[in-house]
């Protein structure tokens, strides 16, 4: 797994995207101090997962982002990508799967807001995934393979426990330590889960027993309901049978009328079928007719097309013939021109021969040349005379020339200034034109940057809102969970309390032994304890309990037959038993008595039976029994005295616990205090009823809370997904904003440079304009001096002209003779030019003749081509003429067939009209018969409605269909059924949905169970009574018990699994410890052996060793270094010099590499403390080991630089911005 390349952008001083390639062997990174070499090491540390900003030479992670410079703004993010070759096929986590790619690309990106992204091969990843890539490879952010600047001594100055980690990395037990740490964390979580599970298990177990009893009662009630339903359905089934019997007779009459209707319907159907066949035949003939017509039209169209094609071909033939005629005419003209040009060439050749002959007749120029020489000598003599005068003129001219030169220089300068001004003006205009467009672009890009920033801010706001919503949802969920926990706890408490009260009631504590035994031996459904029948408001419960406490275990029955009680009492005469005798009309409480009691007590007194909630079936028996018992709000001593002995009552109880009892023997009134110990039967009954209501409410609330909690959890998950998506959008928006901002800054920088250039040009233009004005003033002064010299020169020139006139005459004579000589020479040259011109004309004419010859050949080819096309066209015309005749014949035949088919279709339409008339007549007869059938149907509707009403009543009571209910327990007997209903009736009733099934089932049921109708009715009554005696039923108990039991069993299984998990985790940790100890021991010994060998090589002698501090099997033991450089005693490593420490550290690193070579190694200025000799030994070892591992060196040492295969130079061409340049060394 070797390094391939490192790509960094915006990381520390590397503003722009920089790619550093790493090849096999040794790669060096060099450059001046402070240029950013070590930033490459920091980038490697960072992308490998380093989390400490201090280790990356910064105070915080934001220090890693490009901080800007005098010229550039700070960067928006820092990004580093490390590409590794995966030649050894290492498996890594990419996305949601494990794979082994050929290249591993690790990316880490940091934004200014502190957000960090990790990616593996462009898939989002975790920091853990990146760290796992380097685990146990010897490479990584904190491994021995990367030594940062100034950290070479860290290896020797580290604590023994810290050095141990290097040996562990060699031993490959880092992953075991990570797994052990994860296992210990899992153990802690598992133990917490186990404690919570056991607490929950204990809480559920408390309520399970009470739920079991409630569930058994509910099951009994459910069984009774099913029996009630079954017998009720049987009774109603008899009613269905009677109704269907009446229906059958009525439908027999209806069937006869229907048969007649069916005969007419059959005839009508037959006619309609025939009519439909004829319609089909008509459509078929019509379709054939249309197809034939279509074919006829197609032939007609084809014929028209062919005729048009024939016309076009004839026209084409004419055009081709005209083209041939034109080409032949052109060929004739070209041949004539060719003859003319040949004659012209012959004439030009004759002229050329004549010119050449004349040119040969040369003139003798010797005499002319001697005459010219004599004139030349006389001319020179006269020239000398003139020259003397001329020197004086020249002297003046020299002075004038000086002034002229100055004037010329001024003029040149002015022209130069003018040219410069024009160039500058053009450049200024060009720059202004260029940056006028750039300003618009910059404004647009500013808008784009602003838009990107607004989008980023908007996305940030959305992200913030989503975070707030998620926090609110989490808070709401916590509140819901708290409420749910509170309600669940309250529900469990109340269910437990209810169960206890029901168990107390079921145990019949305080009930006479005789009553208990009696209820156990007889049918308990017919007898009830009076205390179980009494219910009242909570305010009166205490008073009712005091008033009726002596009668709470009295037996009550709705049955007037008391023989069973008497018989039991005879058999068990030693057991006490109270039984409420059959009804006796109460005659104690009259309106007069009640009025007297109200006067005595101040009006606030009520008969007790008016305050009780009694079952309907017991009211007739219990109300007389309670006659004479009253409840008053309160009474004191005065009230007691005001009640006369003559007032008839049995007892009066106040709500505050006082009791007035009248002695039935002597009529005396006694004052008593009610019992205040414990809870009475009435209060317990009230409490049970209240608890059942509260439990029902709590169950609804718990269910709603669970639903709300589930919905909010779903919303929370959706919001979290939205937040993740929003973060991705925000990341993209921020990157887009940073890119656009960078582009804007670049353009602004370019515009700023352009503006600077523009200012310089404008300033230069002003300077040139000023210099030009100064030059114009100087030119005026020169002009005045020149005028003065011109006057003096004019006088000299007059004398010179006189002398020079003679010289001119001589020159004229000389020139005349010389011109004559030159004319002869020109004439000869003219002859030569004419010869050349004639030769050129001959060549041009030959060229034109060649072109004409080619044109003639081309025309011949075209004429041949057109002749061939004419022959082809003539063949096509002949073919078309033959084809057109055939199509015209076929068109005529199709017209004949169309006429015949139209006649046949007319005959068919007439036959169809006759059948339609007959169908109309039958329809009238059917309509009249249907009216008669409707009258019959009205007569039997009532029977059907009654049958439906019975079925409907059963459905309303039990939500089932009576037909299905009967079908569930009846068997069919086809023979008996056929005896009852004949074939015609069966056929008729099959047309009515479900009617046969109902009647068949009703008959079958009546045949088999008719004699048991009375028994079914009695059973129905008994089941209803037994169901009513069960009292309040907790229907939820069955489901609650099953759910709680299932949950309890599930928790038991979970408990076993958690305990097993704890055992497995502890076993795994022990296994990890044993394996780690074994590997560490082996690795330590191997590194120690290599260290003993490498140390003398590095130092050129001496000895060294590694030593374990403590027991080597102790997982916390450290590693110490004992070293003895050459000529020194064995000493502690901390006493060594800086260079010796560095050499010792290098020895240790190379020793580790010999045991377990890392795929790559990065050394940052490790050779800085070493002298030349030690650098040489260091380089030799480095060269030997580079065959197994990649080495990246940051160095200032020239010898080390020579060792590198590839060299990167890091520079700062601009302040604060690093750049890297690579050189391949051989």
From Swiss-Prot:
It comes from Halobacteriovorax marinus (strain ATCC BAA-682 / DSM 15412 / SJ). PANTHER family: STRUCTURAL MAINTENANCE OF CHROMOSOMES PROTEIN 3. It is found in: Cytoplasm. This is Chromosome partition protein Smc. Keywords: ATP-binding, Coiled coil, Cytoplasm, DNA-binding, Nucleotide-binding. InterPro entries: P-loop_NTPase, RecF/RecN/SMC_N, SMC, SMC_hinge, SMC_hinge_sf, SMC_prok. Residues 527-635 form the SMC hinge domain. GO terms for biological process: chromosome condensation; chromosome segregation; DNA replication; sister chromatid cohesion. Contains large globular domains required for ATP hydrolysis at each terminus and a third globular domain forming a flexible SMC hinge near the middle of the molecule. These domains are separated by coiled-coil structures. Residues 173-231, 269-491, 679-741, 775-965, 1006-1078 form a coiled coil.
């Amino acid at each position: 797994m070797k390094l391939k390349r490192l790509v960094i952008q915006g990381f520390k001083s590397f503003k722009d995207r920089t790619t550093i390639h790493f090849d096999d062997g040794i790669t060096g990174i060099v450059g001046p101090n402070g240029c950013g070499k070590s930033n490459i090491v920091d980038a490697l540390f960072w992308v490998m997962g380093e989390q400490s900003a201090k280790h990356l030479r910064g105070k915080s992670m934001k220090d890693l982002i490009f901080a800007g410079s005098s010229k550039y703004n700070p960067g928006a993010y820092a990004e580093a990508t490390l590409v590794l070759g995966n030649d050894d096929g290492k498996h890594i986590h990419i996305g949601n799967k494990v794979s082994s790619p050929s290249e591993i690309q690790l990316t880490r990106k940091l934004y200014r807001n502190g957000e960090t992204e990790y990616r593996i091969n462009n898939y989002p990843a975790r920091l853990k995934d990146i760290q796992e890539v380097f685990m146990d490879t010897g490479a990584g952010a904190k491994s021995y393979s990367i030594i940062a600047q100034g950290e070479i001594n860290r290896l020797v100055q580290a604590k023994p426990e810290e050095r141990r980690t290097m040996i562990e990395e060699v031993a490959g037990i880092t992953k075991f330590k990570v797994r052990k740490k994860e296992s210990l964390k899992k153990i802690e979580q598992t133990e917490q889960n186990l404690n919570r599970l056991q607490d929950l298990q204990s809480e559920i177990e408390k309520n399970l027993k009470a739920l079991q009893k409630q569930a058994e009662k509910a099951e009994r009630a459910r069984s009774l309901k099913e029996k009630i339903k079954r017998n009720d359905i049987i009774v109603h089934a008899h009613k269905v049978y009677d109704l269907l019997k009446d229906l059958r007779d009525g439908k027999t009459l209806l069937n006869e009328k229907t048969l007649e209707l069916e005969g007419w319907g059959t005839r009508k159907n037959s006619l309609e079928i025939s009519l439909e066949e004829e319609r089909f035949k008509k459509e078929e003939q019509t379709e054939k007719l249309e197809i034939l017509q279509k074919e006829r039209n197609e032939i007609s169209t084809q014929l028209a097309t062919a005729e048009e094609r024939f016309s076009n071909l004839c026209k084409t033939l004419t055009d081709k013939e005209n083209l041939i005629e034109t080409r032949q005419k052109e060929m004739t003209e070209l041949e004539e021109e060719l003859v003319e040009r040949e004659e012209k060439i012959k004439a030009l050749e004759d002229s050329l021969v004549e010119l050449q002959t004349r040119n040969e007749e040369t003139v003798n120029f010797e005499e002319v040349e001697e005459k010219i020489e004599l004139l030349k000598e006389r001319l020179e003599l006269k020239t000398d005379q003139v020259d003397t005068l001329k020197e004086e003129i020249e002297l003046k001219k020299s002075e004038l020339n000086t002034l002229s030169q100055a004037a010329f220089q001024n003029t040149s300068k002015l022209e130069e200034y003018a040219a410069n001004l024009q160039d500058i003006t053009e450049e200024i205009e060009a720059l202004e034109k260029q940056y006028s467009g750039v300003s618009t672009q910059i404004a647009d890009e500013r808008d784009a940057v602003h838009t990107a920033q607004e989008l980023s801010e908007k996305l940030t706001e959305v992200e913030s809102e989503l975070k707030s919503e998620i926090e609110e949802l989490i808070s709401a969920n916590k509140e819901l969970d708290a409420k749910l926990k509170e309600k669940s706890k309250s529900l469990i408490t109340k269910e437990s309390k209810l169960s206890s009260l029901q168990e107390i009631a079921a145990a019949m504590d305080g009930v006479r032994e005789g009553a208990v035994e009696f209820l156990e031996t007889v049918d308990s459904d017919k007898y009830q304890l009076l205390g179980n029948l009494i219910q009242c408001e909570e305010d009166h419960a205490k008073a009712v309990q005091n008033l009726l406490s002596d009668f709470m275990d009295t037996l009550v029955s709705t049955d007037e037959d008391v023989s069973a009680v008497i018989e039991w009492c005879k058999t068990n005469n030693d057991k006490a038993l109270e039984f409420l005798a059959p009804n006796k009309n109460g005659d104690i409480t009259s309106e007069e008595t009640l009025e007297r009691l109200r006067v005595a007590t101040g009006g606030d007194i009520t008969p007790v039976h008016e305050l009780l909630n009694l079952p309907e079936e017991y009211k007739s028996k219990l109300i007389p029994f309670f006659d004479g018992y009253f409840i008053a709000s309160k009474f004191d001593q005065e009230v007691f005295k005001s009640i006369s002995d003559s007032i008839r009552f049995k007892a009066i109880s106040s709500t505050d616990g006082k009791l007035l009892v009248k002695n039935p023997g002597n009529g005396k009134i006694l004052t008593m205090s009610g019992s205040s110990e414990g809870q009475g039967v009435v209060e317990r009954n009230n409490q049970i009823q209240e608890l059942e209501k509260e439990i029902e409410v709590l169950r609804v609330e718990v269910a709603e809370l669970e639903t709300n909690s589930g919905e909010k959890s779903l919303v929370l998950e959706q919001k979290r997904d939205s937040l993740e998506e929003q973060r991705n959008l925000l990341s993209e928006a921020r990157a887009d904003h940073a890119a656009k901002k960078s582009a804007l800054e670049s353009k602004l920088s370019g515009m700023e440079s352009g503006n600077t250039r523009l200012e310089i040009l404008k300033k230069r233009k002003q300077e040139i304009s000023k210099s030009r004005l100064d030059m114009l003033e100087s030119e005026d002064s020169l002009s005045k001096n020149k005028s003065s010299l011109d006057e003096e020169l004019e006088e000299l020139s007059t004398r010179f002209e006189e002398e020079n006139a003679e010289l001119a005459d001589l020159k004229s004579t000389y020139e005349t003779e010389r011109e004559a000589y030159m004319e002869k020479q020109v004439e000869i040259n003219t002859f030569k030019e004419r010869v050349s011109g004639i030769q050129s004309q001959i060549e041009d004419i030959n060229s034109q003749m060649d072109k004409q010859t080619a044109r003639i050949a081309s025309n011949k080819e075209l004429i041949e081509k057109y002749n061939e096309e004419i022959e082809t066209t003539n063949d096509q015309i002949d073919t078309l003429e033959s084809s057109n005749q055939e199509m015209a014949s076929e068109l005529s035949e199709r017209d004949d067939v169309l006429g015949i088919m139209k006649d046949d279709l007319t005959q068919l339409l007439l036959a169809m009209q006759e059948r339609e008339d007959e169908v109309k007549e039958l329809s009238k007869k059917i309509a009249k018969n249907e009216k008669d059938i409707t009258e019959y149907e009205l007569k039997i509707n009532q029977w059907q409605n009654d049958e439906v009403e019975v079925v409907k009543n059963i459905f309303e009571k039990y939500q089932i269909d009576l037909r299905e209910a009967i079908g569930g327990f009846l068997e069919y007997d086809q023979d008996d059924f056929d005896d009852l209903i004949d074939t015609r009736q069966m056929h008729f009733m099959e047309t009515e949905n479900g009617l046969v099934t109902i009647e068949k089932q009703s008959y079958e049921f009546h045949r088999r169970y008719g004699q048991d109708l009375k028994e079914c009715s009695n059973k129905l009554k008994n089941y209803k009574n037994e169901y009513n005696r069960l009292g309040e039923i907790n229907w939820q108990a069955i489901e609650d018990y099953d759910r709680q039991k299932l949950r309890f069993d599930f928790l038991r299984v979970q408990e076993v699994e958690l305990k097993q998990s704890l055992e497995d985790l502890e076993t795994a940790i022990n296994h990890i410890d044993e394996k780690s100890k074994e590997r560490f021991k082996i690795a330590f010994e191997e590194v120690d052996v290599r260290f003993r060998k490498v140390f003398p090589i590095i130092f050129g002698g001496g000895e060294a060793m590694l030593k374990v501090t403590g027991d080597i099997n102790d997982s916390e033991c450290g590693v110490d270094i004992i070293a003895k450089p050459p000529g020194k005693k064995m000493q502690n490593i901390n006493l060594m010099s800086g260079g010796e420490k560095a050499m010792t550290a290098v020895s240790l690193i190379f020793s580790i590499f010999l045991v377990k070579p890392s795929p790559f190694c990065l050394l940052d200025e490790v050779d800085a403390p070493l002298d030349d000799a030690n650098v040489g030994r260091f380089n030799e070892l480095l060269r030997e080991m580079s065959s197994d591992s990649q080495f990246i060196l940051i160095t200032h040492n020239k010898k080390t630089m020579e060792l590198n295969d590839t060299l990167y130079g890091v520079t700062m061409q601009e302040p604060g911005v690093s750049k890297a340049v690579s050189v391949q060394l051989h």
